[in-house]
From Swiss-Prot:
It is an enzyme of class 2 (transferase). The lineage of its organism: Bacteria, Pseudomonadati, Pseudomonadota, Alphaproteobacteria, Hyphomicrobiales. This is Thymidine kinase. Its EC number is 2.7.1.21. It comes from Mesorhizobium japonicum (strain LMG 29417 / CECT 9101 / MAFF 303099) (Mesorhizobium loti (strain MAFF 303099)). NCBIfam families: PRK04296.1-5. The gene is tdk. ATP binds at A9, T10, M11, N12, A13, G14, K15, T16, D87, E88, A89, Q90. It catalyses: thymidine + ATP = dTMP + ADP + H(+). Keywords: ATP-binding, Cytoplasm, DNA synthesis, Kinase, Metal-binding, Nucleotide-binding, Transferase, Zinc. Belongs to the thymidine kinase family.
């Protein structure tokens, strides 16, 4: 039976690079993959999945209200789909996560989702919450904090280099997010007193 996978991490852990490599592995063997990326903050109908190291490929965009099961099923009727990949899966709606589960359960197509677990305030995204609840396989993609510990949280830096402690859940631009361990995230967010001098400028 096919499975629904959720590969989650903080920013700059290499999630997108892993997605592109996995899709390439299928295509290298003559198999067809279907790629999706969040279109919530993009214009037009053409999506692009790109990694920090320069890899990129075209992808279909998904937005709120889209029926992903119907889109994959229609494509599968004409061309066999061997695997579905979803980048920025944190932006999925709960119902769309269930649609992806149906792709695995009813069409027997593996679905590989990649995304963030929490936002800069330590709160779950809607798509991540649903994936953590129903995905068959959860995989943490690891990166490190400035102190060398495993990074599990992110902070957002404003244009002035100061840590943002409030605001909209999403700000466009990967350069404004920094991955930290829980300890240093609490310090930067003002939840705990800092005991080192390697932090960012406080707001």
């Amino acid at each position: 039976m096919a499975k629904l996978y959720f590969n989650y991490a903080t920013m700059n852990a290499g999630k997108t690079t892993m997605l592109l490599q996995a899709s390439y592995n299928y295509r290298e063997r003559g198999m067809t993959t279907m790629l999706f990326v969040a279109g919530h903050y993009r214009k037009g109908d053409s999506g692009l999945i790109s990694s920090r190291i320069g890899l990129e490929t075209e992808a279909e965009m998904f937005r709120d209200g889209d029926d992903l099961f119907a889109r994959v099923a229609e494509h599968h009727d004409h061309t066999t789909v061997h695997c579905v990949f979803v980048d920025e899966a944190q932006f999925l709606e709960e119902e769309q996560v269930w649609q992806l589960a149906r792709i695995a359960d009813r069409l027997n197509i593996p679905v590989m989702c990649y995304g963030l677990r929490t936002d800069f305030q330590g709160k779950l995204f809607s798509g991540s919450r649903a994936l953590l609840a129903i995905a068959d396989d959860l995989r943490e993609v690891r990166t490190i904090c400035r102190c060398g510990r495993k990074a599990t949280m992110v902070v957002r830096l404003g244009a002035d280099g100061k840590v943002a402690r409030q605001g909209e859940q999403v700000a466009i631009g990967k350069d404004v997010y920094v991955s930290l361990c829980r300890r240093h995230w609490e310090e930067e967010m003002g939840r705990a007193a800092p005991d080192d001098f390697i932090g960012f400028m406080k707001s």
